[in-house]
Amino acid sequence: MAQQLPIRFSEVLQLASVGIQPSSFGFANVTLESDKYVCVRDNPNGVNQVVIVDLEDPSNVLRRPISADSVILHPKKKIIALKAQRQLQVFDLEAKAKINSYVMNQDVVYWTWISDSVIGMVTDTSVFHWTVSGSDPVKMFDRHSSLNGTQIISYKSNYNEEWFTLIGISSRDNRIAGNLQLYSKKRKVSQPLESHASAFAVIQPEGVDHEVQVLALASRLPTGSKLSIVEVDRNPNNPAFATKTVDLFFPPEAVNDFPIAIEIGSTYNVAYVVTKYGFIHVYDLETAKCIYMNRVSGESIFVTTAHKSVNGLMAINRKGQVLSVSINPETIIPYILSNLNDPGLAVRMASHANLPGADNLYMQQFQQLMAQGNYSEAAKVAASSPRGILRTSQVIDQFKLIQAAPGQIAPILQYFGTLLDKGPLNEHETIELARPVLAQNRIQLLEKWYGENKLACTEALGDLVKPYNTPFALKIYETANVPNKVVMCLSELGDFGKLATYTSQQNITPDYVSLLQNLVRVNPDQAAEFATQMFNSNPSINLEKIVDIFMSQNLVQQATAFLLDALKDDNPEHSHLQTRLLEINLINAPQVADAILGNQMFTHFDRAVIASLCERAGLVQRALELYDKPADIKRVIVHSNLLNPEWLMNYFSRFSPDEVYDYLREMLRSNLRQNLQIVVQIATRYSDLVGAQRIIEMFEKFKTFEGLYYYLGSIVNITEDPEVVYKYIQAACLMNQFTEVERICRDNNVYNPEKVKNLLKEAKLADQLPLILVCDRYDFVNDLVFYLFRNNMFQFIEIYVQRINPSKTPQVVGALLDIDCDEELVQNLLMSVVGQVPVDELVEEVERRNRLKLLLPYLESLLQSGSQDRAIYDALAKIYIDSNNNPEVFLKENNFYDTLTVGKYCEKRDPYLAFIAYEKGGNDTEIINLCNENSMFKQLARYLLKRSDSNLWSEVLQDSAYRRPLLDQVIATAVPESSDPEAVSIVVKALMEVDLPSQLIELLEKIVLQPSSFSENANLQNLLFLTAIKADKSRVMEYIDKLDKYDVDEIAEIAIENGLYEEAFRIYKIHNKHEQAMKVLVEDIVSLDRAQDYAETVEQPEVWSRLAKAQLDGIRIPDAIESYLKADDPSNYSEVIELASRAGKYEELIKYLLMARSKMHEPDVDSALLIAYAKTNQLTEMETFLIGSNVADVKAVGDECFESKNYEAAKLMYSSISNWSMLATTLVYLGEYQGAVDCARKANSIKVWKQVGTACIDKREFRLAQICGLNLIVHAEELPGLIRLYEERGYFEEVISLMEAGLGLERAHMAFYTELAILYAKYKPERMMEHLKLFWGRLNMAKVIRACDQMHLWNEAVFLYVHDQSYDNAAAVMMEQPEAFDHQSFKDIIVHVANLELYYRALNFYLEQHPMLLTDLLAALTPRIDHPRVIRIFEKSENTPLILNFMVAIQHLNIQAVNHAYNDLLIEMEDYQSLQDSIENYDHFDAIALARRLEKHSLLEFRRIAAYIYRKNKRWTQSIELSKQDRFYKDAIITARDSDQTTIAEDLMKYFVEIGNYECFAAILYTCYHLLRNDLVMEISWRKGLQDYAYPYFINFQCEMFSKVLNLEKDLKDRQAVKSEEESASTIGAGILGNTLMLTQGPMANNNDQFDSFQQASPMPRLGNF
């Protein structure tokens, strides 16, 4: 019955099986945009993840740590769209790149992919479309007001995105209402409708030319449920499509069910309507007829999509099942016919979807229309018949036989026209249509239909078309893939290029050489291309022959092109062809050869031969590349004017240093002027290789300083050899290249400066700039000044300091002063320098020579020019100090000198001037050292107070001899003089940091206790307190009485921290801070009695609260509660409840809690009061409390009472909050089982059902236990534990009764049926098979099979193995357990096993247990077993007679082992006739071995068979001897004839003569006539007188000889006639390729055998041979 269902239903995947949490199975977390991927937002272990499951490969699960509000995946690609609040992002997961992002200004409440590139997004007010490739979202339309307050569940568009539907649902009047907004993009209008689900579809109703676009709507309204199919966007060329509306059925129990989706099956033209509760409705789109309805999911469905691969739908339910539903193409048509009784629908669907099942209807309809003469309708029926059942040759013949009425189109043409309108023709139809079209010479019609893909291209069609149009036939052959006909057509058309391509693609090999020879004469270029393609497709072709073909026509270019492509792999075996290619081109086209060699395409040619040809052709460069001998190279290389310089330089890289040196010398020696430039370039490049010194010597040897200069100039900038640079400078001087000398001296870092300096001095150049540069760079300033001054070149000294390096002016001045130059000259030189002169160095140089005043004019000029160089002011300060020219004013007013330098300069001269300089510069360290050394403590104290630097104070207050006098000045002078609080505070901090409390107290008392500007300073008072607390606690109480500006809280806290509790208490008490005072009493002094007295004294609530907390901490709970009551303070209720509960003070606690309830409404307070009532057993007060208003956590209190086994109180609690689950458990403990079951039914909780059920089982309340159990067995995870509970207590009948009662449950699952089967196996095996037959499809086969194995239920085990398709196990059980064996079943099972070894195990089993059934088993296994192995098995056990029929059945396979065993069995049975048939028909056996065995057989016929075998295997002698032995002379004569050997035939003839059997003599003459020599026959006949027996032979021989002579005579005459004609004809020259002369094959050649026999017959008879 299951096979007759019109749908296919399967579970694609369990989301839980791929590790997704069940809590994630919902509309908000799961999206299903297509049948390719499921996308889930999961949260395992609190980690947000996005899980993508590939539905085509469920093991391919992709997890990404992504946090988002919503995720949708592209329908086809791994492109993911994420929404986090208003942030939208799209990522390509495979490319790992962001595609687009956007921030919305409204919240997106729903979104979905409406196409491959567009996401539809719905906000609270509008609908947007977002093209993710890069643009921003575009608003499409506004939401209709009817959708306000609804949850959007669907947004869809039609195929061209012109119509859209937006659906929202909401709760209204105790039902789920659906609202739909239909929007037209073209008209920009919306229409509101009441609907829950919708889908667009395109159909083509019967009789309508164009497609119709429809919209399917499903709704459930209070008045009824409807499915409507309406037309949208009507085509004006179509008739109007009538709206179809039908009732949508919902079962009575599905009160709250409603449609959630509609999916379209376009192939079948059906709509799948899915409801929330898992019902599927299948409707025909054209008629809106319901085809099928059923429930496919026990859990509610929340998302669906189209399952395109099967034209169905895919859905996901709350259990995480991914379900697939689709039409079953095999059963849908029979179902419609049998169940719906709607032939019209069946025919229409079968035609549209090409389905089986309606064939008879089509045939009946066709024959009926033909009989009525309605040929056009009959043609339509045939054209639309499913699977082409009516498009056959018989139907065509039927139409052809019908005569056309006058003036009407012939029926056969109507038929073909209908077929062409419907689609492409099949092969037979195409042929039948082509014949009349070609006969009318209207081939253009065929070409038109071919272009429209309406024809079925076959070889037969091509053969029909070829006589009319060869190019069109070529297309047909190509489409039909007929290679030989394609090659033929391409050859006829001359399209050899396409021919080569085609043959290469098709892997066929035509006669290429002939094709090439023809093509060379017609199109040489195309021939070259063809030859290349021919070689590429067949590399073994003879290349020499192809080259010869090209060269025979002197096609050098084409031959070259072919060889270049053919030899591109540069194989060694093609060396001769490489040489030939280069020879051809060097002779005919040297430039081509040059290009070939330049591209280095070949490496295996004869280098010597090609090099010589290159030299002759003027290709000097190529010749050099190929020559290896030095003599050849020297001969050619001197012609550098013919060579590319760059190439020549690279060419030298292949030589050793000595060879390079030799070739360069040869080039200079041969023609120095011509080759000098290239030699210099080569020498430059290979300088490191050959050695610069050798090259320098070479140029010097040839006395070419020009070459030396240019060579060294090219390497001087990169060399590290000082000698090379020196030689270059020397050569440049000789070549008068002074600019280059200057550049090298300025920029080069390699040369020896001393050596170059001496060279330049000796050269006495007119321009001393190079010398100046060398001396400046290497600090030879003194030498330079001395040289220039002594040689009266003072102008170059001026040039040096003015233009070259003004920074060296100090050294120049120093050198001039050292040689006693006139000071005026030096001052003038200084005044002439306009560059930046380092004044500090200049001052140092002059000061070292005690000539500082010399600089005064220069320095003052710099000062007047506005220079602010510090060195100038330093120098002026020193001059003013030494000259005592008002230095104090200068030091105080000037801000540009270096205070450190000047102060250091003044320290020994005048400390006060040094202090001024240091103070101006803030040089703290120097001032400290200066004042300490000179006892200037008063100045230092004032300076420190002014500086207000804590670090500086830390430094001076370090323990030293200077600290005490400094502090005295600070306390006595500096601080009293100061009015800056910040400065004083820094001093105080400094004293604190260095821990000088006595001095600090002394300082503070002076400025705080005594009248001063700091007396009222709170910070200083605080500091005084702090210092006293740390250093002298006895003064603290005195300060409390004297001071009043200090920070009370801070000082009190510090006093407490330092143990001065009484002082702290006094501070708080004086300042009326009673709460803090109480805190000191209870926490620090720890005197609760004093605290009690103090609280009674002050009578303040906060004081009582503080006291109560202390009493509570001291576990004086009644006192604490009393204090809290006096304070009227419930704030600390949590701690009071905890401690009072722990101490069991519930009576006191009740008073406190009642006070607290009057002040606040806290759940903890009310809960604690309930607990207190429970603990004091005040159930009446508790019940009153529960009836009244309260905020207690009743469940938690009830749980606590339950845990403490106070079940009566717990019962009250749970009853008040209707907590049926816990109430049921409580009633169990109270023994009220019926009430417990009633509560469990209300709770409907698995845990409760388990608890109540367990209690009922323990109390043997099996009726109640069954009620509980029925609610548990529907949960697979609870079932094993429940069964184990019954089994452990021995209640087997009861558990089986429970399970049987659950068989009718709607939610019965696989585990349920499986466990019931196991129970039957254990306790009621007699009912096991019945259960298996009914429910085998809903069992866990593996578990039930294990149970059957354990309980030895072998028949049941076999049944399960078969239905589980575990045929191997089923067969094994049947062989191992006799009671499970059934021959017929075993035959059906064994043919399906996967383990082939079971075949042979079964054969052995049958051989041992059921030998008479072996033949039947072998018949079933024949196609599957290894026949030689079977034969070996039975041969080994000597049971081959049992399988005789098997061997006969398979002998046609001609297997050696089978033939051998069969023949042995026939010999054993002495059945020679069957043996003869076997040997004649099947030759795969060891014939010689069988013959040797048979020739010794006792029966004559077997020996005759042995002779036959010998004859068949060409053992002629052995066969004849065996035949002679048994006197089978006829067999012997036949053997001699078959041997075709004269010796064997003559020996047998002699044997017959010897034994006197003349009849056999005559017989052999006739039979072996062609083997016997005539002379021998005549001799034997004459000697033995056997002429009468031999005369027939002689007569025939003479006749044959006469015929041969006549033929020879005729042949001779014909030859003479031909020879005469040839002599008279003109001579034809030899062919291009030098073809040799071939002999004409005349009649003589056809009679060689007769001619040979004639020659053998000519000599005289040879007597004496007999």
From Swiss-Prot:
Sequence segments annotated as region (WD40-like repeat 5): 195-255
UniProt cross-references to SMART domains, sorted A to Z: CLH
Coiled coil: none
Record GO biological process: clathrin-dependent endocytosis; endosome to plasma membrane protein transport; Golgi to endosome transport; receptor-mediated endocytosis
Region spans: WD40-like repeat 6: 256-299
Keyword Phosphoprotein appears in the UniProt entry: yes
Membrane topology: Peripheral membrane protein
Gene Ontology MF terms: clathrin light chain binding; structural molecule activity
Residues where Phosphoserine is found: S393
Region annotation (WD40-like repeat 1) ranges: 24-67
Compartments (UniProt record): Cytoplasmic vesicle membrane; Membrane, Coated pit
GO CC term (a single one): actin cortical patch
Record InterPro entries: ARM-type_fold, CHCR, Clathrin_H-chain/VPS_repeat, Clathrin_H-chain_linker_core, Clathrin_H-chain_N, Clathrin_H-chain_propeller_rpt, Clathrin_heavy_chain, TPR-like_helical_dom_sf
CHCR repeat positions: 534-680, 683-825, 830-969, 975-1120, 1124-1265, 1270-1415, 1418-1561
Start and end residues of each stretch annotated as WD40-like repeat 2: 68-107
Pfam families found in the cross-reference section: Clathrin, Clathrin-link, Clathrin_H_link, Clathrin_propel
Region (WD40-like repeat 7): 300-328
Domain remark from Swiss-Prot or TrEMBL: The C-terminal third of the heavy chains forms the hub of the triskelion. This region contains the trimerization domain and the light-chain binding domain involved in the assembly of the clathrin lattice.
Similarity remark: Belongs to the clathrin heavy chain family.
Free-text function comment from the UniProt entry: Clathrin is the major protein of the polyhedral coat of coated pits and vesicles.
Record note on quaternary structure: Clathrin triskelions, composed of 3 heavy chains and 3 light chains, are the basic subunits of the clathrin coat.
Protein name (database record): Probable clathrin heavy chain
Organism from which the protein derives: Schizosaccharomyces pombe (strain 972 / ATCC 24843) (Fission yeast)
